[in-house]
Amino acid sequence: MTKTKKRGEYPLFLLMEISQNKTFWYNKYMYTKNEDELIALGEKLGHLLEKNDVLILTGELGAGKTTLTKGLAKGLDIHQMIKSPTYTIVREYEGRLPLYHLDVYRIEGDADSIDLDEFLFGSGVTVIEWGHLLGENLPSDYLELEILKRDEGREIVFHAHGQRAIELLKGLTDGV
């Protein structure tokens, strides 16, 4: 199902598009061969991001969640060094839009321990590592990126929840 690709293009497989209870799920797969391609993918997505967009990053330790966030930051014209928020819970960066980079693994689903609404409904983009742990505290519209280790590369499974997330995913994959 792959086509001949130029360097830097990503294979893409459409899985499904369904509507259920006014929630849209739109899933796609991509594969990046190395860290540079993962950052480039993040940068492309970062260019598409708008105020109040929410991204959920899932994947085991070392899968590339913070690496992908480095690319997102480049796409948002952020020139600061991007670090994992594992121990600080939240890191904020300034660029074209503010980037709120959260790691909620250590709060064990206790969204009240941080002012989650401040980030979700603030003036920027919110990226949440381990965001699936927040369960019902997640907004209704977000793009989840599941990052899976595949040898030296990464398989990225996109799960779009809501209309804006579908728009982001379609914008990201146009022409791929």
List each model region and its residues.
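Conserved lysine of the Walker
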Residues: 65
